[in-house]
Amino acid sequence: MGKEQELLEAARTGNVGLVEKLLSGKKGLLGSGSGSIPLPGLLSMWRGLNVNCVDGSGYTPLHHASLNGHRDVVLKLLQFEASTNVSDSKGCFPLHLAAWRGDVDIVQILIHHGPSHSRVNEQNLEKETALHCAAQYGHSEVVRVLLQELTDPSMRNSRGETPLDLAALYGRLQVVRMLLTAHPNLMSCNTRKHTPLHLAARNGHYATVQVLLEADMDVNTQTEKGSALHEAALFGKMDVVQLLLDSGIDANIRDCQGRTALDILREHPSQKSQQIASLIHDYMMSDCDRGNFHEDLARHRPIPTPRTSIPSPVPSPSLRHKNDAVTGELSKLLNEIKICRDKDCSFEELCQTISSHSQSMESFGSGRLSDEERNGTLTRINKRPTPPLPPALEEEEKSCGPSGLWEALTPCNGCRNLGFSQDKRCVEIAHSPSLDVFLPEDEDNPYESVATAVTRKPCSLDINLHNACPRNGHFSHVSVSDAERGNHGDDSTGLTPDCSPPSPDTALRNIERVIRPQPKQRTSLSSSQDVQKPLQNHSGDPSEVSSSLGYASFSTSPPASPPISPANCSTGSAEDYALTDEATYQKECIERDDRRNSHVPEQFAGLLHGSSPACESPDNPYQLYGKVRKFSVPEPPLRHGNFLRAPEYSPPFPRTGSEASALKTQREVKPQVVYRTIFHTRVNQGPVTFGEQVDKTTGVHARNGEARSNCTGGSSPANSNTGYEERACTLGRMRSMPKNVLDLQLSRNFSKSDSNLVAVSPIEEEQWGSRGQSSPGKSSPSRLERTPSFTAEWEEIDKIMSSIGAGIGTEMEGITEDHPGPRCPVQSVGQWLDNIGLVQYENHLLSNGFDNVQFMGSNVVEDQDLLEIGILNSAHRQRLLQAIRLLPRVRPIGYDGNNPTSVAEWLESLELGDYTKSFLINGYTSMELVKKIWEIELINVLKINLIGHRKRILASLGDRLHEDPPQKPPRAISLREPTGNHTPPQLSPSLSQAYPNAGSLDVQHLIMQADARRRRNDNYFEDVPRSKLERQMAQVSMQGEWCEPITLRPPNEATSSTPVQYWQHHPEKLIFQSCDYEAYYLGSMLVKELRGTESTHDACAKMRSTEQMKKIPTIVLSVSYKGVKFIDATNKNIIAEHEIRNISCAAQDPEDLSTFAYITKDLKSSHHYCHVFTAFDVNLAYEIILTLGQAFEVAYQLALQARKSGHGSSTLPESFDSKPSKPVPKPRGNIRKSMEQPSMDQKGHANVPWIVEPGQEAKRGANTKAMADAHVYYSGIQRM
């Protein structure tokens, strides 16, 4: 057997020469050229080595050579007839080992050479083929060769795994791709235990999961463990979870135990679990929103469905014919307007030209759609019948006076086409499927907007500005509210228009914008995904069509009951709704509450909305300002999508007596119809992705100035009858404002907005409007001039607008100072989140102290705070921050009259009165002390654990000029030396001992004591310490005389065995208080021979070996300069106390750095015991050891100081007395519990000032070797 062992070793090491020498007596089959074998040769073969000999593991020389990659040895062995089909003790063949190694050459040799060829589908004892071995370890070339040799990739091992399963499990991306390419059917060969997707998701192989999903593997494939989401969530693979969610996985799939992925995460609470649960929760909420989007809105508040959700209707041939006819008629009109412009025709001639064409176009509009065509196009879209328009509305609209192209010709600052339809076509068009709700040119009648616009007189409009800026750009919204919607249809039918006539150039440009919208604007329209919530008429169906960049907007709200009485509008009504893409689930109950709060009947809510959007051109930005005066009636603030706006009021515009009389006559003879027009125009829109837009539509909000005029005693005669008053507005007179002034105005608006959302207050509108007229009852002469010379008039208007624009910037700055920011209504955090569509984060905010919207301004809540409390979605955080910027900022102390005189008053102003007792108990008894507080004191001293409350307190304190925070080494504290009592004062007792009835603590008594201390020392606040410990030192310093300061040696000088240069705590912490640590107490061991750290190491090793055999208690180690107290962690009872003088050594266990021990001496028996503890982590054990060393150093320096002062041993601290104050624990954890409280009449020399060497605090966890060496010897204290 010796030679066989040599052969096996030679094959293992690759010694080809030795292999050939050992096998030379055996004639190779492949090398034989002779036909017959002589007898000596046969005898030699009989006596020769067996080439297939095996060792103890069943390996043949070919196994060894294949496993170790010796190609030449493999060839030599095969030449000497080595068999490739001999298995080892585990059933593995040489091919398995070569595939496991990934040696392609040897795999090919084993398959194609030798007397016997390897069988590629051979399985070992675990049912694994060579393909399993190669796939598991990612040997893609071996996999390719085996696949070419027709290896079966569907074979499973004993665990039911295919090669694809193993490749996915271990993230072998290239192998996965090869297997999927060669055998796509492998994805369907799954078991109930696992799939490749589950295995890849479990181990977090992001790329592998992505490849499997790209290969059309079903993302919702289930096993007994649930979906792949279950696996990824359970094993904390956040990126894979996100990938699966992005792929549309069903998060509601349950495993065999009926648990969803969220249920599993709740069973494993950890930070990673919370983060993954937040991702899944956000996904489920958004998925629910997408799934129920149209259904919920159709059920609760019918609005038009998005354009992309349905196919565009195909116009019928009759419609095309009508469209062509209208196109021809409009072309003629444009040509004649050009001729009028070239000839400089008068305004009257231009009106005649327009009127003649408007009548012909009106005929096309009246017969635009037959009933059958309507059913085939618009009605087919929403499948809801259109309610018939009330006869009163039809009659009113047919008697609306002379027609004219005012809406198209009036230079209304970008409003392309304003007006009304003449019949119920207006209501029917509201069912258009587009988001901006008007059909494009290839649907129905593209020119209806012009046909209806030329048949109506212009409406008196009130215009105000409000801006909304999405993240992807800025645009300005100008609200245009119909001032006559409350007049019940009493339009003035005089021929004189309310606004000055435009020039032919302006009229031509406006008409061209209507009928020839820019292609770029069409793209912007189709790409926007705004969701506009229309108001409802009395029948509950929407009757609004908003427009965008060239498309018309109509809205009618026929009345269903008598006009609103003045009593019902005592406080006004203001609602401003705009739905963002993720806020579609706002509750109807909130809407009803808002209506109830505004004292407006619900059925009339739609009549009080008059939204007006930004009428602004993308190429020439400018603004409109209405003539608005602030009203005296209070009004609730408005909700506007993602932000809150200040209330706006529209007071009545007085008219002359003749106008009022004419209006009164009309009211007596005409039926009263209330209607409104809503114009929506968007500016500078870009493509917006779902979930990233911020309120791109201007919501509807009620102006209702006419109704309020009667409530407050309007002066017009018309008020006495109906309570409604008409107003006039020179719509469009701002068009010629110099562009430089307008650009300056816009730049100021946007540059001063932290939140990119600008809300203009009514005061600004009042001031802007008042500059355009000398008095409320008079208009300047230029307003009423009607001259044929348009150039002269517009030049005069330019001068007026220039004078107005010159002071806009300064006015806005002044107003901004008076009104620092929009105020928010009194509402809960849940309501506020509901308004911005992120109600799912209510618990996140409330549980972390962000529980009051009045104290959640931008100086309190930051992006990092939102991230820390678990809001991981960056888009949601940005939306929250944008809404937070509109909340009121917390006013710092001393700002704007905010000067609280006491701590209690200050905390009550922050609605944090519950912390008053904690502040006073810990010495913060005045605002002077509070102003110097740091966040670390809020956490460690005051125990304010809620980050929202801490941020609220710090924001209230404002930007303070402080020294370095207290966590750094403090400055040298020079305490005064008042004369008087030479006896050192007592140490400050613990709070529970000093105030036994802390639950009913007299707060006023504490304040009186603090005041008395201040009266005893007039210089109390000259050098007020920053921390509670320093304040206690200041209190002690007023009662005794001190010796010279002392200096603590750094750790590396106090003992040579540690390289640490800085202590862990400030010395006063160990004198006036204690450092408390929780740890597991493993027990104690009798130390027969004191050998320093070797004794602690032995005890740690022994305790570790037995810690599994008993119940390990949790204790609190309270370390001070006196020693270490054992405190039961459950009931907080003091079990025992080890004096500092009796502790001789403390060290960490070199084998387990989280285990540490220290040796104490029992004075009664004079025996030493080693007490062993296990900390929760290595860093904590390191800190405890270092704190013990610092406690010894403080006690040592205090003892030296006492000896130098001449007090002798009688004045040494209590820890150096001869008798122990507490029993010492017995060996092996037999600890006696004692309820005896420590004596409070102890004498000590803790009342000594000191100077700490400047430097940084010790750094933890940096070097485990340093930690192991961070033990401290406590010797010499007994020799003093």
Curated annotation (Swiss-Prot):
This is Ankyrin repeat and sterile alpha motif domain-containing protein 1B. The keyword Mitochondrion does not apply. SUPFAM superfamilies: Ankyrin repeat, PH domain-like, SAM/Pointed domain. Residues 1071-1223 form the PID domain. Its main location: cytoplasm. Signal peptide: none annotated. PANTHER family: ANKYRIN REPEAT AND STERILE ALPHA MOTIF DOMAIN-CONTAINING PROTEIN 1, ANKYRIN REPEAT AND STERILE ALPHA MOTIF DOMAIN-CONTAINING PROTEIN 1B. Residues 520-550, 707-723, 770-782, 980-994 have a biased composition (Polar residues). Residues 482-491 have a biased composition (Basic and acidic residues). The keyword GTP-binding does not apply. GO terms for cellular component: cytosol. Residues 824-890, 898-963 form the SAM domain. ANK repeats lie at residues 2-31, 57-86, 90-119, 126-155, 159-188, 192-221, 224-253. Gene3D superfamilies: Ankyrin repeat-containing domain, Pleckstrin-homology domain (PH domain)/Phosphotyrosine-binding domain (PTB), Transcription Factor, Ets-1. InterPro entries: ANKS1/Caskin, Ankyrin_rpt, Ankyrin_rpt-contain_sf, PH-like_dom_sf, PTB/PI_dom, SAM, SAM/pointed_sf, SAM_ANKS1_repeat1. It comes from the Eukaryota. It is found in: Cytoplasm. GO terms for molecular function: ephrin receptor binding. It comes from Danio rerio. Residues 299-322, 361-399, 479-573, 704-723, 755-791, 960-994, 1208-1243 are annotated as: Disordered. GO terms for biological process: ephrin receptor signaling pathway. Keywords: ANK repeat, Cytoplasm, Repeat.
